[in-house]
Amino acid sequence: MQVTQTLNEGLKRGYTITLTGAELDAKVTEKLIEVQPEVEIKGFRKGKVPMAMLRKNFGDRVLGDVLNESVDGAIKDLLDQSGDRPALQPKVEMENGKDWKPGTDAIFTVSYEALPPIPAFDRATVTLERLVVKADEASVTEALENLAKSAQAFEDRKKGTKAKDGDQVVIDFEGFLGDEPFEGGKGEEYPLVLGSNSFIPGFEDQLVGAKAGEDVEVKVTFPAEYGAAHLAGKEATFKCHVHAVKAPKPAEIDDELAKKFGAADLEALKGQVASRLEAEYKGASRAILKRALLDILDAQVKFDLPPSLVEAEAGQIAHQLWHEENPDHHGHDHGAVEPTEEHKTLAERRVRLGLLLAELGRNEKIEVTDAEMTQAVLAAARQYPGHEREFFEFVKGNAQMQQQIRAPLYEEKVIDFIVAGAAVTEKEVSKEELQKAIEALDEL
């Protein structure tokens, strides 16, 4: 075997691997000798099949195995010797594949992009600010009022009172396209809160001012993107009968409300609300801190990036954004989506930070434990109520899905490691200031 380097330019590497016909033949013979004692062919006793017969029956298959093993072994050796870590799976091609015949030399070309050397990074040089928001009494009261509103009841208004925004009207309705009723357009004694936007745009507005006992004809146009194709973009008339007009009555903020939400009493509910608010504030604060840290890393640590990784990431970004802009197109049967310069710039940032965090985690021997993975999978499974076990088994047998779950866990652990060694100061702010800081993240 002869291995010759043909390219060493930046991060690009190229090699030629030559396997002589003689060494391939010798390895085939060696493998056939190994299996000969176990081979049994009609007309020959077990272990007594002649080598010529073995070659005739199994030679091509064994030769294929020898070629694969030899090339894989050569690549492993050259990577061990060079210290290279390929950014993607090395590309292997048989140079004389179409014309190659057993017994002659087999020549393979191997090409890949190596991961770049990552500069050392000292987390102690990082200065960060953590925003702190306390769940004060006003915030807890506001949250309790929202809970009370969500638990509100409705009481009949005085007979003859006109319905207004926020009221609940109890209606029968039937929808028509022209003079023909359409399937799924009928309901009886349906409680509809005006202003909730739970019906087709314009429907609820036309019931404002209605009184109990009245018949109201509502005319609407279904949105062009409406889910039912036979209704999308069509004008329709709904004949409605109003049974009742009811006024909202917020629940009292008391022990009874607390029990509705699983708390022993009002004081216990206040404690739960305060804890939930503080958890939300901490989550938002961490997102801001993490963005600041990643900005620092992106600005301070520079190194060459494998073009193949940047190209793949830019393509993924462009594809994802295209689908976000075209939500009704769920398949991949669309034309090519070309990445823009903005996509490429974002891809460079993601690749740089991904490689940097991965290298730091590798050097510090940071790992995601089995227990952490199990918790993450269980959390993801809750998105599929009633099918948690099936989801768990699916993940268990799918390495790609496991990596999708493990990757963000790993990143967060590396971020935690950096923050733990950085100079972090705390700044107390209001929840409004925290909200503005969160909104600013989306603008960047």
UniProtKB/Swiss-Prot annotation:
It is an enzyme of class 5 (isomerase). It catalyses: [protein]-peptidylproline (omega=180) = [protein]-peptidylproline (omega=0). The keyword Cell cycle applies. It holds the Pfam family Trigger_C. One of its GO terms (molecular function) is protein folding chaperone. GO terms for cellular component: cytoplasm. Its main location: cytoplasm. InterPro entries: PPIase_dom_sf, PPIase_FKBP_dom, Trig_fac, Trigger_fac_C, Trigger_fac_C_sf, Trigger_fac_ribosome-bd_bac, Trigger_fac_ribosome-bd_sf, Trigger_fact/SurA_dom_sf. It comes from the Bacteria. Its EC number is 5.2.1.8. One of its GO terms (biological process) is cell division. This is Trigger factor. The gene is tig.
